[in-house]
Amino acid sequence: MYVLFEGIDGVGKSTQIEILASKFSDAIVTKEPGGTQLGVNLREILLRSSIKIGKRAEILLFLADRAEHFEKLVAPNLGKLILSDRGFISGIAYALANDENLDENVLLELNKFALNDKFADKIIFFEASRELISSRLKARGTSDKIEARGLEYLLKVQSLMKQILIKNGFETLFIDASKSIELISKEIENFINFK
């Protein structure tokens, strides 16, 4: 089962992935970007490098990572539990936040191509309030290029993610990130149907 954990930075995705992975030792844990060697290199360019990249070029680099990630890591392991920290929902939402003139349907089709027509089986979306996001980002102390765009930008991305999920009817668990770690973990296990 291919499961995406979606949401902006600081909402608890990584924590919940770690908890689930500790319970299922054969789970494949990955992330986008950065789940493959190409992804590691692209992540460095996209998030940390001083290289200025155009908006459309940025989208295509993320799509290249997604295609490589799917072909090399996801597709060969589709019979196993795959836990991915981010995926195509993030890709589309960040692209739309960066350029409102983009067509969501075109972005969806490009992602469908990159994923060889195989979207995630289940998606877990973490949503947080302005206050929670602000406090968690401050507690982390560091930021990449995307986080540096500010709180309003991240809230816009979060809103776009939610809209995309609802509009397209993907099988999604909507998580209130302010709930306790334990309660969220139980909700996720019930959603994935592991007992």
From Swiss-Prot:
BP terms from Gene Ontology = dTDP biosynthetic process; dTTP biosynthetic process; dUDP biosynthetic process
List the EC numbers from the record. 2.7.4.9
Query: Which organism does this sequence originate in?
Result: Campylobacter concisus (strain 13826)
Q: Give the first-level EC class, as a single word.
A: transferase
Give the record's family classification: Belongs to the thymidylate kinase family.
UniProt KW Calcium keyword: no
Q: Which residues bind ATP?
A: G7, I8, D9, G10, V11, G12, K13, S14
Reactions it catalyzes: dTMP + ATP = dTDP + ADP
Q: Which Gene3D superfamilies does the record cross-reference, listed alphabetically?
A: P-loop containing nucleotide triphosphate hydrolases
- InterPro entries named in the record: P-loop_NTPase, Thymidylate_kin-like_dom, Thymidylate_kinase
* Entry GO terms, CC: cytosol
Provide the protein name.
Thymidylate kinase
